[in-house]
Amino acid sequence: MENIIKSNPYSNALISTAENPQVAQSGALAGIALAVKDNICTNEMHTTCASGILETFTSPFDATVVDLLKQEGVSIVGKANLDEFGMGSDNANSWFGPVFNPLYPDEPHTPGGSSGGSAAAVAADMCHFALGTDTGGSVRYPAAQCSVIGLKPSYGLISRHGVIAYAQSLDTVGILTKDIDLLEKVFNILNKYDPLDPTSLTPHKRAKLKPPKPHRKLTFGLVKEYNIKGISENVKMAWSQIMDELIKMGHEVVTCSIPAIKNALPAYYAIAPAEASSNFARFDGIRYGSRAPEDRGEHGTLYAPTRQEYFGNEVKRRMWLGTWNLSTDAFNHDYIRSQKIRRILQEDFDEVFNRPNVLSGNEGQKANDEPGVDFIIAPTSNCAPYPLSKLNDSAPVDTYLNDVLTVPASLTGIPSLNIPWKTKQGNVGMQIMGQYGDDLGVMKVGRLLLDKCKELHQD
């Protein structure tokens, strides 16, 4: 709590804090402090989604992930700030004000988003780990910007029950921490089938997931399409250094191509807002949440004034975009076409990986004889955190490009782990991606690289 009192007034990482967090005497997580992203339901604190429309909303139940962690003795210290409803990548779109990156105390810098509060809370040692949600990069990108570890698990492994949906075919609950061992422990607690979540991977499918093989020579993919224009020299240097170190350790690095990556970002921004526009129909101020007094006016308006007053500009922008994508004029050209691109992207990734995809009808059999890879390593962000003042000089949609490196793993549902890689110019976020269900393998590689980075910088 001392670190919260010290750091939260500047960073604004936590929207609400527990007055007297309970400390359990037993359980795998006894004595461990947790911050929960404020779009994950808790029955003892408000769940606001950083939106005015839910400013006073308290859920009658805990999300499944919260319940599982409570059973293991975790202490919840607060609810973490975010971009409203998870829409954004700078954590500047919050009803409760922006989050400032605690690594830059002299000038407000972005912590990344949308789980910026979760990442900032971990970076400032307000908690041992935090829960976030990752729809298109919202755990990995802020983890990269705040120099912490962030996991987006395989879609369906961790329950979404009690997570207020943004885009249900993409939303995943992720974990942020500084400790790779704690990350694996929390993942194993949460990696359970949940009958309350219709998208939870069934026990039958889970039984097909193979554990990572014992230590052996691995093959890492260097995907050409991730080498996009605009990547800073420092990020390129970190990427190259990691690949060199893997070769020195006896592993193999091969160059490969996933052509559909170039279409991933526009496909994401057709699919995600379309799902959001449908999900957000429930926010009308009638059944729960804030309601504008004009809603009962003489003109008979029911909920338009409430949404106008309590939704932020970015939420309204994406709802308009999503509604358009589902309209008669755009449905076939934009939405259906984007779903086809998503399928092609999944097939392209399956062609690259050695392991089969248990979700594919052919069990992931490769259509060609080219050697596959075990893991893909690429940058999480193309540059270091920038001052929040920069947002004043850019168009709102310019920040959509922040997702360009993280969206492919979201569209395909594969696990992706951000780790901080130290360079002379500061830490760089690098992501490790594996085949669907190989989350433990991804964490194993993450531990390998974190140990190597520590070894290189012992002095």
Curated annotation (Swiss-Prot):
It holds the Pfam family Amidase. One of its GO terms (cellular component) is glutamyl-tRNA(Gln) amidotransferase complex. This is Glutamyl-tRNA(Gln) amidotransferase subunit A, mitochondrial. Its EC number is 6.3.5.7. InterPro entries: Amidase (IPR000120), Amidase_CS (IPR020556), Amidase_dom (IPR023631), AS_sf (IPR036928), GatA (IPR004412). Keywords: ATP-binding, Ligase, Mitochondrion, Nucleotide-binding, Protein biosynthesis. The gene is HER2. Allows the formation of correctly charged Gln-tRNA(Gln) through the transamidation of misacylated Glu-tRNA(Gln) in the mitochondria. The reaction takes place in the presence of glutamine and ATP through an activated gamma-phospho-Glu-tRNA(Gln). Subunit of the heterotrimeric GatFAB amidotransferase (AdT) complex, composed of A, B and F subunits. One of its GO terms (biological process) is mitochondrial translation. NCBIfam families: gatA (TIGR00132). It catalyses: L-glutamyl-tRNA(Gln) + L-glutamine + ATP + H2O = L-glutaminyl-tRNA(Gln) + L-glutamate + ADP + phosphate + H(+). The active site is at K37 (charge relay system), S114 (charge relay system), S138 (acyl-ester intermediate). GO terms for molecular function: ATP binding; glutaminyl-tRNA synthase (glutamine-hydrolyzing) activity. Belongs to the amidase family. GatA subfamily. The lineage of its organism: Eukaryota, Fungi, Dikarya, Ascomycota, Saccharomycotina. It is found in: Mitochondrion.
